[in-house]
Amino acid sequence: MKNRLLILSLLVSVPAFAWQPQTGDIIFQISRSSQSKAIQLATHTDYSHTGMLVIRNKKPYVFEAVGPVKYTPLKQWIAHGEKGKYVVRRVEGGLSVEQQQKLAQTAKRYLGKPYDFSFSWSDDRQYCSEVVWKVYQNALGMRVGEQQKLKEFDLSSPQVQAKLKERYGKNIPLEETVVSPQAVFDAPQLTTVAKEWPLFSW
């Protein structure tokens, strides 16, 4: 009887801790792209790709820059990552409905933009952490992560050097302003709300 009561109490308490996706949540994963390892080495982090959650028709999508900027169903996005691993960060204290609406509306400006393989700080093309950063900045005036210069990253490894040569040849733009997935992850306004969560209700 005691065991049954314990099991019931655990089942009742689980929903209080379950992650409920909200527009504005920022999700991170290890990408399977050809540049993923170079990003990890240059930024000294596990996470090489990020996107922002947007709830559309009551279903969660990840707004991401990969190919063109687009919405990807959340479960599909997670499946694309290395071993299905992911971490979700949210503005501490949560976002108001109005703030979530502003983020969703601002995100639409970037839909269809081509991927920025040169990591330049312009609005013509976008890479993953750049578009998340710009949506937050333009919608809420919030800087989720510190901008850096390309030269501030660890560019010493052979994998990073090879990718730089592939993208830029001999003219590496060391003074280019960039924002990395790790910089977004480390934004002090954010707190972790989910990590490799195994159960989905959508």
From Swiss-Prot:
Q: Which gene encodes it?
A: yiiX
Pfam families, alphabetized: Peptidase_C92
SUPFAM superfamilies this protein is in?
Cysteine proteinases
Claim: Signal is one of the keywords in the record:
yes
Membership in a protein family: To E.coli YebB.
**Per its UniProt entry, which superkingdom is the organism in?**
Bacteria
Task: Give the record's keywords alphabetically.
Answer: Signal
Species of provenance: Escherichia coli (strain K12)
Specify the protein name. Uncharacterized protein YiiX
Q: What is the lineage of its organism?
A: Bacteria, Pseudomonadati, Pseudomonadota, Gammaproteobacteria, Enterobacterales
Signal peptide range equals 1-18
